[in-house]
Amino acid sequence: MKKWIVSAAVSMALSAVVAVHAEEAKNAPAADNPVKVEMRLLNDAFKNLLVSLILNNPGAIEEPFHEVHRAKANTEKALEKGEIKLPKNSNKMKEFIHMDEQFHGKLEALIEASRKGDMKAVQDVTHKLLNGCVQCHNKFRN
């Protein structure tokens, strides 16, 4: 019963997020920039991560992050070609790249913890990742 209540609460909260995300996706240009594509996949992976944490299901955490990793390769190619323009502080591209590399390193730690079933470590890394999201968005996103 307790799991059902938690699942219902999580579903309701995520429904609101999904509705906003769906609206953004409708308004996204067809040839969206790779950073935005990666961020949307990361958003989906994070929603799954939170549900997996709440339901104590470490086995469900890893898979969505593989899509994020594949998208990162496209982002890196676009960065190398100079095709990425940051909405804010675009003159600090090296710092953006450094923060991104640190973030993806933490994602690897998250996956390792989930493979071991260490949900305390998953929770700790999740907090660090979320802090990284907020810092990066504050610095580089409008």
Predicted regions and their residues:
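Positively charged n-region of N-terminal signal peptides that target proteins for export
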Residues: 1-4
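The canonical Cys-X-X-Cys-His
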Residues: 129-141
